[in-house]
Every structure is written in structure tokens, then in C-alpha cells.
Amino acid sequence: MTLFAVLGAMTFAAKYAMAFLPNIEPVSLFVMLFAVTFGKKAVYPIYLYVAMELLFFGIGTWNIMYLYIWGVLALAAYGCRSMESSLGWAILSGGFGLLFGAFCAPVDLAVGGVGYAVSKWISGIPFDLAHCAGNFVIALVLFKPMRRLTERLYSR
């Protein structure tokens, strides 16, 4: 459990350290790593990270999105856990970043209706593109070495 607590806190700290870059974050990489390394136990570091976001930044509609959006990525990554290609992981992570606004749309629809959800999604496209590019590059460069490190830490 200590490892999961440290990894959840590390995810929060790493995102916060990169906050000056719009929609470029390491959280997607960590969620994928946790899913492929820990399986079902990935919920511990993932939702510790979500709890820290809620405690640090307060409550908003994005909290609802975070309750399911990281689980979607974790399930996708777990389904691809046997994939060896760095490019494949980069495509998965980049695709998730590109679709992030779409994944948020159901909550926006419930909160503000169709007009609000559509306008928010469209206005967020430049940020989704940045999210896509950032996720792609981060996963392409770091997924394989970080996977080896995470697996080594978990085996101890």
C-alpha cells in the first residue's frame, strides 16, 4: 500500500509541476503504467490522485469527470497490456488526450444542456490537440523505461 500511496502522490506532484504547460501532463502516462503493472490494484494510486486533486483544488464538475475518465484510460491500457510497441502506447495516450473533451461531454451535457456541452467541447479543441501532442510525446519517450521501473518496484 505504501507504494500505491507514493505513486498517487507522485502523480499529483508531477501534474502540478507541469501545470504551467496547458493540457500537457504526465497523468495519462502514470494511469497507463499503473493499469498494466498493477491490474485491478491500479485503482489505489489513480483514485488517491483524484482525491488529492479534489482536496487541493476544491469541488467542481471536473471532479465527476475524473471519477470515470481515468478509469476509461486504465481499462483501455489494461486491455493493451501485452503491447510492446512504444508507438502503440503513444497512439493510445495521444488518442485519449484528443478525446478528453468528448469524455467530459456527458457531464457537461447533464450540467448545462446540449448548447453548453457542444460549445465547451468545440472551444476546448485547441487544448485537446495540445493534450494529444503532449501525451503522445511523453508516452513515446517514457512509457517503456517507466514500465520497466514500475514493474521492478512492484516486484519488490
Locate predicted features:
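Structural signal for the C-terminal ends of transmembrane alpha-helices
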Residues: V36-G39, A76-E84, K144-E151
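Hydrophobic transmembrane alpha-helices
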Residues: M1-L33, T37, K41-P45
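Interfacial aromatic-anchored transmembrane helix boundaries in multi-pass membrane proteins
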Residues: F12-E25, L48-M83, G112
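Membrane-helix interface segments
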Residues: M1, K40-P45, S82-G88, A117
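Membrane-embedded alpha-helical hairpins and interfacial helices in multi-pass inner-membrane proteins
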Residues: N63-L67, S85-R156
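Central hydrophobic cores of alpha-helical transmembrane segments
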Residues: V43-L55, G88-L98
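Residues within alpha-helical transmembrane segments of multi-pass membrane proteins, especially transporters
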Residues: M10-A13, A17, F30-L33, T37, ...
